[in-house]
């Protein structure tokens, strides 16, 4: 037997009918136990390498044990716990955290989000808006509805402030008791309209009360012309009719009506339109057929009044200049050794004061030449002395 076994090749079975029991190796079973206890997701161990020639009764018992072992291991494989999902990265992970999944350990992001939500809730409470804000884009979220509401509110407040300031300027509201307003130094930031400064514009009465002709009395013609022109200076219109005649005065009235219907005339600086009486007098001065002598006779009283007003203003300026000069002389201190300069200045000052006193005394003052006449229009001109 030993020889036959030695003559046989490796892996070859003998032809003998003797029962031969092959004992299986213990290594596969031990490995199966180790793997089965260490990992729940393991494959069942197959015994295809073990050959066992036993009796039928023993074989049936072994098969029952193998089936029960197979079922137990299969049940263990089906009851394995679910695999843990990998840690999410990027925006998808943030979405799962927001949707109730695993929380992301982002402390500062949560703090910033809470602050933004508090600020938005405050704005919504102030503005009375309703609705939820879509924060799916988080820091890139832009609430355009809220921005539009804020811009509209800001523009309305700015418009109200402008309207309020404009109303104050238009009505000329001033604080009572202010020193600047009492002294006449206070001024409005915005110039008042012409109607507030000059009243409603005087409109010409084109129809009049009755018709006038060349044969009518000069007083009647002058009164009707003054009424149609709405001119308060009736004496001036009467002198125009008396010097130029009824015909020329009526022609000027017709030209004035035509100019007024076409829009009127501006004054010299263009700040406002002339009144109908101003248009009438302007046409009178610019008519070639009317001589300068006639114009002087018509405006003699007005020119005389204007001259008197200028004369009174000049006298007031001269008196103010004399007071300033006296105050300046009292404040000066001359050196004792400089007798010449003191005497010269005193003599010149006395002459100047004497001339001022003469100018203040009577109306019969002599007219100075153009070279000798010095007119002081402002108190700052004292610096030249």
Curated annotation (Swiss-Prot):
The modification Phosphoserine is found at residues 14, 16, 56-57, 60, 63, 347. GO terms for biological process: protein transport; RNA stabilization; snRNA export from nucleus. The modification N-acetylalanine is found at residue 2. Residues 164-184, 364-385 have a biased composition (Basic and acidic residues). A motif (Nuclear localization signal) lies at residues 71-74, 189-192. GO terms for cellular component: Cajal body; cytoplasm; neuronal cell body; nucleus; ribonucleoprotein complex. Phosphorylated in the nucleus. Dephosphorylated in the cytoplasm. One of its GO terms (molecular function) is RNA binding. InterPro entries: PHAX, PHAX_RNA-binding_domain, PHAX_RNA-binding_sf. Keywords: Acetylation, Cytoplasm, Nucleus, Phosphoprotein, Protein transport, RNA-binding, Transport. Residues 2-320 are annotated as: Necessary for interaction with CBP80. Found in a U snRNA export complex with PHAX/RNUXA, NCBP1/CBP80, NCBP2/CBP20, RAN, XPO1 and m7G-capped RNA. Part of a precomplex with PHAX/RNUXA, NCBP1/CBP80, NCBP2/CBP20 and m7G-capped RNA. Interacts with NCBP1/CBP80. Found in a complex with snoRNA. Interacts with NCBP2/CBP20. Interacts with DDX39A; this interaction stimulates PHAX RNA binding activity. A phosphoprotein adapter involved in the XPO1-mediated U snRNA export from the nucleus. Bridge components required for U snRNA export, the cap binding complex (CBC)-bound snRNA on the one hand and the GTPase Ran in its active GTP-bound form together with the export receptor XPO1 on the other. Its phosphorylation in the nucleus is required for U snRNA export complex assembly and export, while its dephosphorylation in the cytoplasm causes export complex disassembly. It is recycled back to the nucleus via the importin alpha/beta heterodimeric import receptor. Belongs to the PHAX family. This is Phosphorylated adapter RNA export protein. It comes from Mus musculus (Mouse). The lineage of its organism: Eukaryota, Metazoa, Chordata, Craniata, Vertebrata. The gene is Phax.
């Amino acid at each position: 037997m030993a020889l036959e076994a030695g003559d046989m090749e490796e892996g070859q079975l003998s032809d003998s009918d003797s029962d031969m029991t092959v004992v299986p190796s213990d290594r596969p079973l031990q490995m199966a136990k180790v793997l089965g206890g260490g990992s729940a997701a393991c494959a069942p161990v197959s015994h295809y390498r073990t050959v066992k020639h036993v009796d039928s009764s023993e074989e049936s018992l072994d098969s029952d044990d193998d089936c029960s072992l197979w079922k137990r291991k299969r049940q263990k494989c089906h009851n394995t716990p679910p695999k843990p999902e990998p840690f999410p990265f990027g925006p998808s992970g943030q979405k799962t955290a927001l949707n109730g999944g695993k929380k992301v350990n982002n402390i500062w992001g949560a703090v910033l989000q809470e602050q933004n939500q508090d600020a938005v809730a405050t704005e919504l409470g102030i503005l009375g808006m309703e609705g939820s804000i879509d924060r799916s884009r988080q820091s890139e979220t832009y609430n355009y509805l809220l921005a539009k509401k804020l811009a509209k509110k800001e523009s309305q407040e700015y418009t109200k402030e402008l309207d309020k300031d404009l109303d104050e300027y238009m009505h000329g509201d001033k604080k009572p008791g202010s020193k600047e307003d009492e002294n006449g130094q206070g001024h409005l930031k915005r110039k008042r309209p012409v109607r507030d400064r000059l009243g409603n514009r005087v409109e010409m009465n084109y129809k009049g009360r009755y018709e006038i002709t060349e044969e009518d009395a000069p007083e009647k013609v002058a009164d009707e012309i003054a009424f149609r022109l709405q001119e308060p200076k009736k004496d001036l219109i009467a002198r125009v009719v008396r010097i130029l005649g009824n015909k020329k005065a009526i022609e000027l009235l017709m030209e004035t009506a035509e100019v007024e219907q076409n829009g009127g005339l501006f004054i010299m600086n263009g700040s406002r339109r002339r009144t109908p009486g101003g248009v009438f007098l302007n046409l009178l001065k610019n008519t070639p057929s009317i001589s300068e002598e006639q114009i002087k006779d018509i405006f003699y009283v007005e020119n005389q009044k204007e001259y008197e007003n200028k004369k009174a203003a000049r006298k007031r300026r001269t008196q103010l200049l004399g007071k300033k000069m006296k105050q300046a002389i009292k404040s000066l201190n001359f050196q004792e050794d400089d007798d010449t300069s003191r005497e010269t200045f005193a003599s010149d000052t006395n002459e100047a004061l004497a001339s001022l006193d003469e100018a203040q005394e009577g109306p019969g003052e002599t007219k100075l030449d153009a070279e000798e006449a010095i007119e002081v229009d402002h108190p700052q001109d004292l610096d030249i002395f």
